[in-house]
Amino acid sequence: MGEGAKMDIAMMMQNLMLAAKAQGLDTCVQAAWNAYHSIVMPLLGAPEDEMLIGAMALGYADQNHIVNTLKPPREAVDNFTQWLWD
């Protein structure tokens, strides 16, 4: 699978996440499963010629759960973005 196909999948997942949020659902993209593809793929009944690119949980987040209170530091958008106007 080429880089272009992986980018297509990423864009599709982003659109699914936006559509889910518009319907009141939450999502959590997970790439950690990729390291366990040899375990996960047989459990899914996936053919040998398929790849695990990522996973996504879909549902209702418990906003009060401790795991959902983590706010990691983030770089300010203006520190890595150049806005071109006019």
Spell out what each predicted region is.
Residues 1-43:
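Small-aliphatic-rich amphipathic alpha-helix that forms the alpha element of a beta-alpha
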Residues 45-48:
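Short, hinge-like loop/turn segments at secondary-structure boundaries
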Residues 52-86:
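C-terminal helix-cap and adjacent tail motif
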